[in-house]
Amino acid sequence: MNKKMTDYVIDLVEVLNKQQKQIFWGFFDIASMVLSIIVSYILFYGLINPAPVDYVIYTGLTFIFYQIMIGFWGLNASISRYSKITDFMKIFFGVTISSILSYIICYAFLPLFSVRFIVLFILLTTFLILLPRITWQLIYSRRKKGNGEGEHRRTFLIGAGDGGALFMNSYQHPTSDLELVGILDNDEKKKGQKLGKIPVLGSYDDLPELAKRFRVEKVIVAIPSLDPSEYERILQMCNHIGLKCYKMPMIESVVQGIQPPIGGFQKIDITDLLGRKEIRLDESRLGSEITGKTILVTGAGGSIGSEICRQVSRFNPERVILLGHGENSIYLIYHELIRKFQEIDFVPVIADIQDYDRLLQVFEQYEPAIVYHAAAHKHVPMMERNPKEAFKNNILGTYNVARAVDAARVPKMVMISTDKAVNPPNVMGATKRVAELIVTGFNQRSQSTYCAVRFGNVLGSRGSVIPVFERQIAEGGPVTVTDFRMTRYFMTIPEASRLVIHAGAYAKDGEVFILDMGKPVRIYDLAKKMVLLSGHTENEIPIVGVGIRPGEKLYEELLVSTELVDNQVMDKIFVGKVNVMPLEMIDQKIEEFRTMQGSELKRAIISFANETTHAD
């Protein structure tokens, strides 16, 4: 097979999903067994007769038992680039046990097989099953080397605890491009000891000196619980001496087989330096809320909407409706999800939330159990310039979704709000505050349950400052912040999405749910950490203040004092109770807004939002 053909086959197999890989390897396995039974027959009897039914039954039983065993061991789709000797041993035992079980069953009815025949069959089958897998690894490894990826890089591992031990268990596999020369750990008792065959050379502080002595090119952090300040210190040392710094995937992802310990390295990102650990919530009651049901997400192509779709799909709903206005973003999330979750029915729907009739038609057709309303305009300065669009999308759009939920008798609606809805000085925050009023207004009148979810800035979302900083750093700076005093609450996209899903499970009576996001972060500190992550210093990439933009606040709030309640639905999730306004009054106010334009509309919405926030 020439190089082009080899590359073609590798690329073809690499894009297969889990189910398709099972079929791919299953084809090789059954072919190996058929060939083994034929060869064994020829060697024992010296000729080929038409295959007796006995041998067909024996081969079929062996294949069924074998598939059950390797499926139990999780090997039916995983034998590829990251296989270990233990995986190959399991295949041998799987073939052996399956063959013996089939022999016992067949011998009771068809005493035609000798023990020598079965032994030969086991050896031939094991050889033929392992041959394509080992060949696959060798070809893939050689291809990596041909692409310049296979050069061994001298590497330090940071962490001699559980994470380091898990790393070492998978270190010696054929596609690794690492040459591990030492381990660093701050536990003095571990210095001089070995993890596997690799010595613990010293502490983190010894990194610059030891890296120079051992000519190290790369550092891998294998401590999932490492304090953010320690991450930052290690990163500063690596930047100073020109080392690349990576982290091992989360232990949970490695244990569950989502990512390999080797080859799944990630660069240290901003979430590692934020000063708090990512919040994970109790998911015990989400299965009954989602499993087997139809879920609809508006704004499904956006940063939050798409992550809600991913998180919801983990709980095996029957169907997920991906509703959005942008065809390209819906197309992308649709094709991502159908690859990852083949058993779920994903339905892409192009629709505008400003079109009530279209929404009602979709809701009545698919009968969702929960609607997650993520579609909204979120950019503060942009909405200051376009207040009419903020009104149409965030207020009218939310009203249409809530009204369609009521009319179609959808059991629950969860609306995504923002901390900018609290005491809003800008039109974006004000429209989201009015959207909260719409949700609570419908909750008072409808048989459906409505709730809202407030959270702060979402790291990595389209409206986040992170992509802006990344672009400015890539262009050589400067990095611009509006005011060095400005602070914001931050959370990750998965955190925000999990909160939204939990809100749906705990919603009862028009609540506003808020996640404990820790302390607010100075935007200036965030910018400094981003520069550090890029491998530069502030002398190379300066950070400058440009002044507060229209509609921005120095500080954000999550609740005003009148919205606080005493209870928590669960750890890290607080409940607020917003002032409720009769839906008839909201209808009247919306009609007034329809007649306004520009600055008049902006002032009216902001004034109304603040009046309702502080009303008794």
Model-derived features with residue positions:
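Signature of alpha-helical transmembrane segments in polytopic membrane proteins
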Residues: M1-G150, H240, K247, V371
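Flexible, Lys/Arg-rich cytosolic regulatory linkers and terminal tails that connect or flank
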Residues: N2-Y8, Y231-T294
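Conserved Rossmann-fold NAD(P)-dependent oxidoreductase catalytic core, especially the SDR/UDP-sugar
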Residues: I241, Q256-G257, H373, H377-E436, ...
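Conserved Rossmann-fold cofactor-binding substructure of NAD(P)-dependent oxidoreductases
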Residues: I350-I370
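Proline-aspartate-enriched helix->loop->beta-strand connector
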Residues: A211, R215-E217, P317-E318, F363, ...
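A solvent-exposed beta-alpha-beta segment
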Residues: Y45-N49, I139-G257, N328-L332, R339, ...
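Strand-loop microenvironment adjacent to phosphate/nucleotide-handling motifs in alpha/beta enzyme folds
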Residues: R280, R285-E289, G441-N457, R462-D616
